[in-house]
């Protein structure tokens, strides 16, 4: 087990993912508690454990500081009543129906070794299913168009998208004379024609579902790409089609009732999503 874990080099999986790989590749079935103990004894901490340990140590340090302040002064200060920044905005409650809200984002990460690319991703807020993914060199209109096409093809028309305030969603008009660069007109027009509302937010907690998904993907996907010797965007986009099915089976399926509406036929979608050239 230790040799297997070491074989991943610097790109090591978290303990739960490692247990899945052990069962799949070596036919070794141990609980994550047992494997975690073996790794600890050998001096290994999983990436997830390191983050959890840092949070615990940070909380312990804060507690000690508060205790020291209490001993030094009986009068409360303003800092005693300040809320932690990450708690100032409560998390958004999960929606009830599939298609009611789709959260979208793009994650820049070295998915293939040292090469940084952007993974455009969309997750259904109610079910937790990934409904669209696409790799591109940058966060692009083209990337989100591919994600939208995947949603329309497999699921249908959702009620609303939730995104951050990126240029591709909120920029009303560019100074360029190229219609191609008027990104809001491009994506916003397509959504308007389909009857999809777009909401934007700069608050991470508001789109916590897709933020957490990005963290999970960054932990798992690079290892699976490496295992399958995938080193290019085109290879990765083909691989993602079957990878998503396995991911959703394991982590999604939290809602069954749907409000997705029937999407236009492929020919109509192609016309609607066609990018306007010069």
PLM features per residue range, with description:
Residues 1-10:
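Positively charged, polyanion-binding regions of nucleic-acid-associated proteins
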Residues 12-14, 105, 224-240:
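Short, charged, surface-exposed loops that flank catalytic or proteolytic processing sites
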Residues 14-28:
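DNA-recognition alpha helix
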Residues 28, 40, 45-129, 140-159, ...:
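Mobile-element integrase/transposase regions
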Residues 31-34:
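Short coil turns linking two alpha-helices in DNA-binding domains
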Residues 78-83, 244-278:
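C-terminal, beta-rich DNA-binding module of retroviral/retroelements integrases
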Residues 163-165, 176-220, 236:
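RNase H-like two-metal-ion nuclease catalytic core shared by retroviral integrases
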